[in-house]
Each structure stands twice: as C-alpha cells, then as structure tokens.
Regions:
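Generic signature of intrinsically disordered, low-complexity, basic-rich segments
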Residues: 9, 24, 31, 55-57, ...
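Short glycine-rich, low-complexity/disordered patches
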Residues: 26-30, 45-48, 94-105
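Amphipathic alpha-helical binding modules
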Residues: 65-115
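Short, charged early-sequence alpha-helical segments and their helix-coil boundaries
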Residues: 41-75
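Short alpha-helix boundary/capping elements
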Residues: 21, 35-43, 53-57, 89-92
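Short terminal alpha-helical segments
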Residues: 1-36
Length: 115
C-alpha cells in the first residue's frame, strides 16, 4: 500500500459511514487489503487496478459509495476514523511481524454520550 496520508483516512472514514455499524471493522480491513493489492498490481503491471485504483487508501475508498465529510466532533464519523486507523495499524503490524494468519482483534471503539 502506498503511504497513508490524512486525506486517505478521511476518504476511508467517509466510505465506512455508508456501511452498517456492525460490518465496519471488516469493511475497514477489506479497504486496506484492497489498497495493498492495488499497489502490488500497479508495481507488477505498471498500471492502476481497474477497481481499486493506484494503491492509495483514498483511491480504494473513493471507488465505493461514500458519505460527505463530517465534523470531527460527530461521534459516528470519529468512530469511522478510528476504525480506519486501527485497520492500517493492524495491516502494518501483520507486515512487520510476518503473522499472516492471525485473526485481528476487535478495535476499541469509543461510545459517545451526549449531554
């Protein structure tokens, strides 16, 4: 996967907003895996992947339905940003440790209480 920038995280969170809450963690991991696969495809064949783009998280995310960007104090949007960060972190840890078959732990998701 190409280097992850702020815009990649925002695009990923926007895509996750269109996914039902119970399926978001899996969707976040799939999004990161698709970006990685697209980058390997690009390097091997010298062209972008037809469905997942150029290997950036943003390209993979914007190829899916996505919601408009929300404010950072929106609890649902904040949870989606956290999930994208957790998915990237999980992907990096698996690459560094070489643990390919490990099952990912559920990320810690903060539930916001409105006052």
């Amino acid at each position: 996967m190409r280097p992850v920038l702020h815009g990649d995280l925002v695009a990923g969170a926007r895509a996750l907003l269109c996914v039902p809450r119970g399926l978001r963690w899996r969707a976040a991991r799939d999004l990161v895996a698709q970006a990685d696969a697209a980058d390997r495809y690009r390097r091997r064949l010298c062209r972008i992947h037809p469905d997942w783009g150029n290997g950036t998280l943003m390209a993979a995310a914007l190829g899916r339905p996505h919601a408009p960007e929300r404010r950072l104090d929106d609890p649902d949007y904040a949870d989606c940003l956290i999930l994208v960060l957790e998915a990237v972190r999980h992907w990096r840890q698996r690459r560094w440790t070489g643990v390919i078959g490990a099952r990912p732990a559920k990320p810690m998701v903060f539930h916001h209480v409105r006052r």
